[in-house]
A protein has these predicted regions:
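Nucleic-acid nuclease catalytic cores
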Residues: 82-108
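Acidic-basic catalytic patches of nuclease active cores, encompassing PD-(D/E)XK
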Residues: 1-36, 84
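Conserved catalytic cores of phosphodiester-cleaving nucleases, focusing on short active-site segments
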Residues: 43-64
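Beta-rich catalytic cores
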Residues: 39
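Intrinsically disordered, low-complexity terminal regions enriched in charged/polar residues
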Residues: 100-148
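Basic, amphipathic alpha-helical patches used to engage nucleic acids or provide basic targeting signals
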Residues: 72-85
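Active-site-adjacent loop/helix micro-motif of nuclease/hydrolase catalytic cores
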Residues: 63-75
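Short His-Asn-centered micro-motif
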Residues: 33, 59-60, 92-95
Length: 148
């Protein structure tokens, strides 16, 4: 049986990443609930005045080295949302004490380099799931843009 594994700490870390990224873009953000039945991704950034959605976002918090992996359904959702809305999608992450992002789709086409690999594992402190080793989208780290 697959279990929802996001903890309160995970959601707090996501919020911190959204705050940094949205401030960098001069936007506001909305974070989807872990229990959302509509979306797998973490949320989006928007213009508070016009209410226009500006981009789609998935967050990853790495205590050490960034892996830049996404499971195939999340990657598919981000790409599909970008194709339907013509808005960009990002993988936003923290590595050590810095943050960065990868532009996955620019609203027109997929712009990141990636491979599909069989990999994964159970993160420390998480409940093991039967699908922890799975096909993952491994994004080339040369695509990373580091924030300030």
């Amino acid at each position: 049986m697959i279990k929802i594994r996001e903890t309160k700490e995970d959601l707090i870390k996501q919020t911190r990443l959204f705050e940094v990224f949205s401030r960098h873009l001069n936007l506001s953000f909305n974070q989807f609930s872990s229990f959302s039945k509509k979306y797998r991704i973490d949320g989006y950034c928007y213009d508070i005045k016009s209410k226009d959605i500006v981009c789609w976002v998935e967050c990853k918090w790495y205590n050490n080295k960034a892996h830049c992996f996404l499971n195939v359904p999340k990657f598919n959702e981000l790409i599909s949302l970008s194709e339907v809305t013509s808005l960009p999608s990002y993988l936003l992450f923290r590595e050590h004490n810095r943050w960065g992002y990868v532009l996955l789709h620019d609203g027109d086409k997929v712009v990141c380099d990636y491979k599909t690999k069989l990999m994964g594992g159970t993160p420390k402190g998480r409940v093991a799931n039967s699908d922890d080793i799975e096909p993952l989208i491994a994004i080339n780290k040369s695509n990373i843009v580091w924030g300030s």
